[in-house]
């Protein structure tokens, strides 16, 4: 899925958000990955990414890949794709065959337990870059519980998170009134402030 074709006029209607437990896609012998495409401001639209995603879905089985969800940050021109695959090479081959738009980074990740989407609020993906060897999945699980304990105070609903232990990268998906609410929740819960808080639209 993951990369846009050409910039078009963006549809203001947000894609419908559906609860989907992606852990069901982490089948025997496969792993979860998030691949990231940096196209640049003004270079993508949600509609363009959706078209590219459809092309990925048309060829993914050939390479043993299952694209689960994707998130689009049109302001920065960045796309994040969640998939289940045997390895990173399979993801690259799928994108190459589908539309030729290759990811800049691919992270092998573990995820938390997905919560229900409430709807009616903006969707945010916040990124923590903690450094190689500085975080474990267990650490993030504990921090996530602290987030859940205080999130209502700021009107936030944390939906899920993904951890790459090798590079020390954590990505958290949430619904919130604004980015400051996400930051305030993290700050009060455990003090770990994200490097980026991106407003995104989700597709699958």
PLM feature spans:
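Charge-rich, low-aromatic oligomerization/scaffolding segments with amphipathic character
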Residues: 91-96, 182-186
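A common structural junction motif
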Residues: 98-105, 189-196
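Short S/T/G/P-rich N-terminal loop/turn motif that feeds into the first structured element of a domain
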Residues: 3, 7-62, 66-68, 72-77, ...
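Generic short alpha-helical segment signal, independent of protein family or function
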Residues: 84, 96-99
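C-terminal end-helix/capping segment
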Residues: 196-202
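Helix N-cap motif at beta-to-alpha junctions
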Residues: 84-90, 175-180
């Amino acid at each position: 899925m993951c990369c846009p074709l050409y910039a078009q006029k963006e549809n203001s209607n947000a894609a419908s958000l559906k609860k989907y437990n992606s852990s069901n896609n982490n089948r025997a012998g496969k792993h979860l990955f998030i691949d990231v495409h940096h196209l640049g401001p003004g270079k993508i639209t949600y509609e363009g990414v959706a078209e590219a995603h459809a092309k990925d879905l048309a060829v993914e089985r050939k390479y043993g890949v299952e694209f689960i969800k994707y998130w689009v940050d049109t302001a920065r021109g960045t796309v994040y794709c969640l998939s289940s695959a045997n390895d990173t090479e399979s993801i690259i081959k799928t994108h190459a065959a589908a539309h030729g738009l290759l990811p800049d980074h691919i992270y092998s990740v573990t995820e938390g337990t997905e919560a229900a989407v409430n709807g009616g609020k903006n969707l945010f993906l916040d990124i923590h870059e903690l450094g190689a060897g500085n975080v474990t999945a267990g650490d993030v699980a504990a921090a996530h519980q602290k987030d859940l304990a205080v999130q209502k105070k700021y009107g936030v609903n944390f939906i899920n998170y993904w951890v790459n232990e090798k590079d020390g990268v954590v990505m958290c998906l949430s619904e919130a009134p604004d980015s400051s609410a996400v930051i305030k929740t993290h700050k009060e819960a455990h003090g770990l402030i994200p490097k980026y808080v991106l407003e995104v639209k989700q597709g699958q």
